[in-house]
Amino acid sequence: MASKASGGSTRNGRDSNSKRLGVKAFGGQFVKAGSIIIRQRGTKVHPGKNVGLGSDYTIFALKDGIVKFEEKGKKNFVSIEPVEASA
């Protein structure tokens, strides 16, 4: 016979890997086309001009330029101000 009752199983004791969400390029920063600007869950920030929205709601640059964040009403938008190449 067991001299000690078996310990009850715990319900906690798990932790998921961090998803590294958040802003990757801040306002006023220069980015190249294809660069990720924000990783997010849902559209906390909406895409503006010269910006694309991925299937996982990642916002990325479509053109080279300066990142610009703006509020329109209750919604936040991010867009890219294109920079003309000085030749």
From Swiss-Prot:
SUPFAM superfamilies from the xrefs? Ribosomal L27 protein-like (SSF110324)
Homology family: Belongs to the bacterial ribosomal protein bL27 family.
Which residue stretches belong to region Disordered? 1-21
One Pfam entry name: Ribosomal_L27
What's in the GO CC field?
cytosolic large ribosomal subunit
Instruction: Fetch the InterPro entries from UniProt.
Output: Ribosomal_bL27, Ribosomal_bL27_CS
Listed GO MF terms: structural constituent of ribosome
User: Where is the sequence biased in composition, kind Polar residues?
Assistant: 1-11
Asked if Transmembrane helix is a keyword of the record, the answer is: no
| Keyword rRNA-binding in annotation | no
> What is the name attached to this protein's record?
Large ribosomal subunit protein bL27
**Record keywords:** Ribonucleoprotein, Ribosomal protein
Q: Which GO terms describe its biological process?
A: translation
